[in-house]
Amino acid sequence: MEHVLPGQAPIRDFVHHNTLHGFQHLPFAAALEEAERLTGIRGYLPENEFRALHRKGRIDDADIDTVLDRHLGAAGEEILAVAGGEPVTRRQIHRLRLTVDLEPVDPARFTWLVDELEALDRFDPEVSPEARRRLMESAKRGRGEAVASRRLVRDLWDACLERLGLGDYTASHPEDLLGHAIAHAEALYADFKAESSGGGLSVSHRAMREEARALLAEEIDAVGREQTLRGFILKLTGQDVLDRVRPQLIRHCASHLDEGLAAWHSPDRSLGFYAAWKRSMRHGAEGGLGEVPLGHAELDALPDDPAEVVVFELEQRGIPLPYWEGYLERLALELPGWSGMMNWRAHRPLYRANRTAPVSLMDYLAVRLILDRRYLGRICSETWGIGGHIGELARYFEAHLSEFVVRHALYCGDLPEFLAATCADLVRRAGCERVDRKPWRVAADMIFSWRHAPGAGRDLRIRLHGSGWRLFKLAQHLGLSAHDVQALSASEIERLLCALDELTPAQRGYLWLCAYERHYREPLFNALASNHGRGRWATRDERPQAQIVFCMDDREEGVRRHLEELNPAVETLGAAGFFGIPMYWQGLDDAEPSALCPIVVIPSHEVREVPRPGEEAARRLHDHRRGVVRLLGRVFNQEIRRNLLSSHLLIDLVAPGVAVGLIAKVLLPRWAATLSRWLADLWMPEVPTTLALHAADDAAPAGPEQPRPGLTDAEQADRVAAFLLNIGLTQGFAPIVVLMGHGSASRNNPHLAAYDCGACSGRHGGPNARVFAAMANRPQVREQLAQRGLVVPADTWFVGAEHNTCSEEITWFDVQDIPPLSRIGWHAFAAQLDEACRLSAQERCRRFASAPRRPSPARALRHVSTRSVDFSQARPELGHATNAAALIGRRSVSRGLFLDRRVFLISYDPTRDPEGRILEGILLAAGPVGAGINLEYYFSTVNNERHGCGSKVAHNVTGLFGIMEGAASDLRTGLPRQMAEVHEAMRLQVVVEQTPEILAAIYRRQPPIRELVGNGWILLSAIDPGDGTISVFDPERGFVPWAGAATDMALCGRSTDWFEGHVEPLAPALIAV
């Protein structure tokens, strides 16, 4: 079941991942179709949004033509009809099907289009000028004179209906058509009465029963495969049992999973969810006061083993054994957030919260099934006087088919108002068919006759508002006049209309996506080809003034670019932000260690932050005062909510201060944050710290099961050497080498971890940078590196730092250890980095709606800094929004390009990796990280309400592990709308500087890479290290040369010249180097 449930961790440990991780073994398009079949969630942007992107120029005609040619091949040139002397090909029809809304319309919308927009007298607004011209010229030739556009369009409509044999309805107002259905239904019912007066059943009634019997069998068979009993009952009563179950179930789930928000906890949490629930129902008020109380005898009868409960409940419902798995899967998907969290915790028994509250998905399903049975049984008993067994329901409705028809049509169908009102009144008055059979039979026969009435109901909608409307719009966009339509043969019209449905909605979505991706990919490839040979540091012939290794994060692309523009002698590199140091980290104030590494890695070592020698007294004072702050926090956050006496006193006491603080946060957030930071520093002065990272050479072996404090000299040298080799930094070391981790800081932001470093399990990467620098500076490590042929000059000093991607602040670590000779160079570099951050803030402001237009760098920095401390700000930063590509290679490939902060930059030197072994490791480590980020943003963008978690405005934090909307919603997973609203939903385009042959060999060797690349979850291309030629990977053909060609590009003196004044995504541009 894990493959269909959300795999999101608790929100404090948020790590980006593929939302459809359970379908990753399938090709991308097939996976989206299978997920939609199972969950009903579409995996592409709505077509109207794609069409809006086409109108804006984010997708152009060449993109659409290219993907259609690839999809159709030679079949696209097949001639379907000859109209107006011109052939109409399948490719033309498919192209119009993509770019124009050619869906059938329902009668109500048709009425609105005719009455309000005069759709039968005016051209479709989206008809191109060329098509209008052809249409008007054709009409003039056909009539021998010019025709007014209103008359021309009306004639076209009449001609379409005439060719489809619908001419009888051209003069009728759509609302009048309802009268045909009513009259026909009444006539059929009169026949029924006449035929049945002789004691038999009418022909129409017998037909209705046969149709009903088939539908009933279909619905019964779907229980366990496509729906649960809840869905079946919902279709027949309009009552959703989940509305009654959800509040009770969620209350218990939230209490059991709580990680620190609740003031009280159940004393039985350690027994597991099911056992704790049973005890709560027995001893708590809810067991006796619930809407459907569970008595002690019934609770005692329940097995202690939740698995036995699940088996018992499924048998009680009459679900066939082969359908059990599907039934439980459907049941879990009715509340996927809560089911997914239970499942996530169940698969991670070592998770810290499981120590006091173990979790099992079987526990959850057992409780859900018990509650379902109680409420389903009540509905069935009150409505039909039977239990909630699928067999009883089947037998009842087999004997009362008329009632089944009426109820199913009322709650699932699209009945006209006169029939819906009749059926609703019947359900309300009669209750069920066993009370009075006649009115149910009358209503069922009327429904049947309405559905099968010629010229009315569904038949008319399919033909008039379907074929007629679609042919009418299609003719306009093809430039066909009434004369041209009348000249078409019946077979030609049929071929044209059939061609409109040859592309399924999923296929159209995939074609649009491919066109969207191509529109981004072609300028990117053009930029890389045009930039070949321009960038510095391809060979590092001269020594850089400074080197800085950033995380591969796309948000760092802008800072790197601005820094290089400020000082071309600086070399920037990129890598996964844990810097090759997987570890458990425990900061000075941390209660327990946290893993700082990719989520798939389990660390074997632990590193602690400790006070520097001589700072013991400062540490004791710090701990004492921090203890006071924590005590006050517990009193304010929990005691005030649970103690009757103290809550009254404390509320009166703290209310004035809270009011003043709230006003300051709202009106003066920057000033309030500064004051708060000053008071915190005054009360708890910072303790100078160092790292406890060394372990003796004879220390016990380290492993994931028994993490060991510290690393030996050899282990430290192993990690430093491997990382430097991976990024290609094995010679040409600068005097200052900075390791720049990153994190994000903002207020009132439950999704804070989603802005942090994905390579550090959703936490800050500064500690990893600090640890790496400390290791690389140790003489013992340098000595071992030299023995391995990796010589680091004596005057090179590594410095750890952390970049706040929200406020653009830089935090430096252990600067007091920088040697005096290196300190001058570090000061100069730090000043340049600060200026680069100001320029980065200026670039970011162009995408914020509330930011000043064209701000100076200093003003832009103030703005982003204020956003980071404004607790009312729903968009403190935009995170990874707009990420679209990853570039693995030397910085010379991309240096000198404006990439709009959309590209993950990962350093790799192909000239030092002839067999691709280093690249193989990079792809295995960084590939899933980049793909996880990209795919989570993709799915949260295409359907934010289902794959994402909706707007932050309605979110409530639940138990410090998740968010809900209100107090009784599902647990929301994915990204909030404010994080994804500017994102362009497309798959990650990975470009690797290496030969296609080496990449193909890696692809064949590594199943994880084959799954991601071969199934199309990410897109792979190669750029040759020698001549810069680009090859694109096709899962069916392998690497094929890029079909495009380098064209002239804009050349700018600096990035500001390109982005200033623009708020939209920008294409790459060349920057002077």
UniProtKB/Swiss-Prot annotation:
Names of the cofactor(s): Zn(2+)
Location (main, coarse): membrane
Keywords: Cell inner membrane, Cell membrane, Membrane, Metal-binding, Transport, Zinc
Keyword Cell inner membrane: yes
Pfam family, one: DabA
Gene Ontology CC annotation, any one: plasma membrane
Gene Ontology molecular function: any one: zinc ion binding
Compartments where located: Cell inner membrane
Annotated Zn(2+) binding sites: 551, 553, 742, 757
Membrane-related topology note: Peripheral membrane protein
InterPro entries hit by this protein: DabA (IPR018752)
Top-level taxonomic group: Bacteria
Coiled-coil annotated spans: none
HAMAP family for this protein: DabA
Subunit description: Forms a complex with DabB.
Function: Part of an energy-coupled inorganic carbon pump.
UniProt record similarity statement: Belongs to the inorganic carbon transporter (TC 9.A.2) DabA family.
Name listed for the protein in its UniProt record: Probable inorganic carbon transporter subunit DabA
Species the sequence originates in: Methylococcus capsulatus (strain ATCC 33009 / NCIMB 11132 / Bath)
Gene (name only): dabA
